[in-house]
Amino acid sequence: MKINITERRNKYVKIKQKLAENLCKKDFIDRTRRLYMNKIKLFAGALTFMTTMAPPIHVYAATASHAELNAAEKNIDLDKSVNLQNSINLTDEIAKENQDSNIMFSPTSLNFALGMIAEGAKGETKNALNEYLGTDDFAAYARKYMNVIKSYNTEDENYGYTSKLKIADALWVNRGLTLQEQFQKNAEDNFEAKAEILDFSDKENTCNTINAWCNENTDGLIPEIMKPDMLNENSELCLTNSLYFESGWSQDPWDVSDEKEKFGDNEETKYMTSIGDNYYENDAATAFEKYYANNLSFIGILPKAEGDFTLDELDIEGLLKSEPEYDEVNCKMPKLNFETTAELSDILSRIGLENVFSDDADFSGIADKAVHVSSVLQKTKLELDENGTKAAAVTAVTMECMSAM
């Protein structure tokens, strides 16, 4: 059963019994609290969106929102598979470059795209990618993760509707480039990535083909990732990853204000109020959790300090590993609907991956020509309202022939 989150789902809502008024409840995200200017920083991470206890979906925002795919019971140890700290650092770097904008970022989508090229990397290039990803066998993690993802596309018998969580990968190969047989096999076996031959000299048709794949795998939420000016005479290969999540809320409904209220310094928006399921707190931040179907959850994080902050300063890992202080909390937050486009090449170079973009890169395990990464682009979109959430990410890694020596 497919749920359309643009329609109200009152018939599906299961109202749980609320605690007595004299029990511990906390008002959370009051509109009089500062909300980090008018910014929402979304860290949609190992959304596959990233926690350290299992492969996840995470979203962090400046009131940080975090959606988590809780798969600890699936015996996948994310601590040993994905470098959470690198993802937090990268999110903070993206925020620095977009100080006046809401942002959303998916570490998992990026990691899967980088994980694919790591399959054909050697020497220093391989070491740099392994260091960033936090494992020398990302392919094994990818296989397990994709199997876990599939188990969440089922109807939740408690609430009568289905969450949707899907991941896809693809290889787009310029005519005349020959992929190494082992690389192509590894990409298909571990990432379910099929290779399609295109004529990159026909830039418009190449982009249309890739964008059609992008549109299909995000249910239309992200209709395109490539533009013709992203390709040139040296472009030889494009690797893409997509992530898509959709679900309604599984517990108490959100009530929406009739009038818009101030959000941050300038923006006005409608707010939603509800009962959250858990309340967390550390020295730097407070957080609430609210469930979707199939034990997926959203976590909103509010920093205690005024002014600018980084995700690193909030000790998100410690916060989310802690036991909740209360099992109910009054929560209030704005509706969210925005998208982000982030060119990640410069940021990745600054945090340790400069080799993959240089003529010193060794991707001899990928193709019969010497190639390096020329561009890493990610697009994300989030729609969150009283009925549920839709979130998507697409990452495209473009590779070129190296310049002649």
Give short role names for the model-derived ranges.
Residues I5, I15-K18, E68-E73, S322:
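Active-site-proximal helix-loop elements at catalytic-domain edges
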Residues K2, E7-K14, K18-Y36:
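Short, Lys/Arg-enriched N-terminal segments with co-localized hydrophobic residues
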Residues Y60-L129, G220, E224, S403:
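Flexible propeptides and autoinhibitory/regulatory segments associated with cysteine proteases
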Residues P303-E325:
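Internal alpha/beta scaffold segment
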Residues A62-A67, A71, D100, F138-A305, ...:
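Non-catalytic, conformational "gating/processing" segments within enzyme and secreted inhibitor domains
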Residues E131-Y132, N174:
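Short acidic/histidine-centered micro-motifs embedded in hydrophobic/aromatic stretches
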Residues M37-Y60:
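Sec-dependent N-terminal signal peptides of Gram-positive bacterial secreted proteins and lipoproteins
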